[in-house]
């Protein structure tokens, strides 16, 4: 499985390359529009599989207000699923509101893990 860091690097490469950007950015916007998670009130970071130890640690580092907002979005989406209804257009999440809140913590944790592995494999020269 690819790490979040490698996915971000690939995304940055796509955004720096004009030809790839002209292909992938409209496709990504179309995918987000048709996936329907915003009509349930969810942000993209809410879709990250949370039974991963790295994600669990990142969730524990979130500020209290962000944890509350995440839980509220999850409960709203669950209620929409139970009732088989989508949120109205004024209550659905706008694309401008879909900002990453968990990804910075995940990247920080992956950098810490890489640094830990590097320090564990240091050979001391005498």
From Swiss-Prot:
Quick check: keyword Membrane in the entry?
Answer: yes
Annotated Gene Ontology cellular components are: mitochondrial inner membrane; respiratory chain complex III
**Bilayer topology:** Peripheral membrane protein
**Keyword Electron transport among record annotations:** yes
Instruction: Cite the InterPro entries for this sequence.
Output: QCR7, QCR7_sf
Please list the GO biological process terms of this entry: mitochondrial electron transport, ubiquinol to cytochrome c
Question: Pfam families, alphabetically?
Answer: UCR_14kD
Q: Which domain of life is it from?
A: Eukaryota
Question: Which compartment or compartments is the protein found in?
Answer: Mitochondrion inner membrane
Q: Which UniProt keywords apply?
A: Electron transport, Membrane, Mitochondrion, Mitochondrion inner membrane, Respiratory chain, Transport
> Which function does this protein serve?
Component of the ubiquinol-cytochrome c oxidoreductase, a multisubunit transmembrane complex that is part of the mitochondrial electron transport chain which drives oxidative phosphorylation.
Q: Which family does it belong to?
A: Belongs to the UQCRB/QCR7 family.
Its subunit composition reads: Component of the ubiquinol-cytochrome c oxidoreductase (cytochrome b-c1 complex, complex III, CIII), a multisubunit enzyme composed of 3 respiratory subunits cytochrome b, cytochrome c1 and Rieske protein, 2 core protein subunits, and additional low-molecular weight protein subunits. The complex exists as an obligatory dimer and forms supercomplexes (SCs) in the inner mitochondrial membrane with cytochrome c oxidase (complex IV, CIV).
Know the name of this protein? Answer: Cytochrome b-c1 complex subunit 7
Give the source species.
Answer: Cyberlindnera jadinii (Torula yeast)
């Amino acid at each position: 499985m690819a790490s979040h860091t490698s996915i971000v690097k690939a995304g940055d490469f796509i955004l720096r390359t004009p030809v790839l950007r002209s292909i992938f950015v409209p496709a990504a916007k179309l995918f987000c529009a048709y996936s329907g998670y915003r009509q349930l009130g969810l942000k993209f970071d809410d879709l990250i599989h949370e039974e991963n130890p790295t994600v669990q640690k990142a969730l524990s580092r979130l500020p209290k207000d962000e944890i509350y907002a995440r839980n509220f979005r999850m409960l709203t989406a669950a209620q929409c699923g139970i009732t088989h209804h989508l949120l109205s257009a004024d209550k659905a999440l706008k694309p401008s509101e879909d900002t990453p809140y968990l990804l910075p913590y995940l990247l920080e944790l992956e950098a810490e893990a890489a640094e830990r592995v590097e320090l564990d494999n240091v050979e001391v020269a005498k």
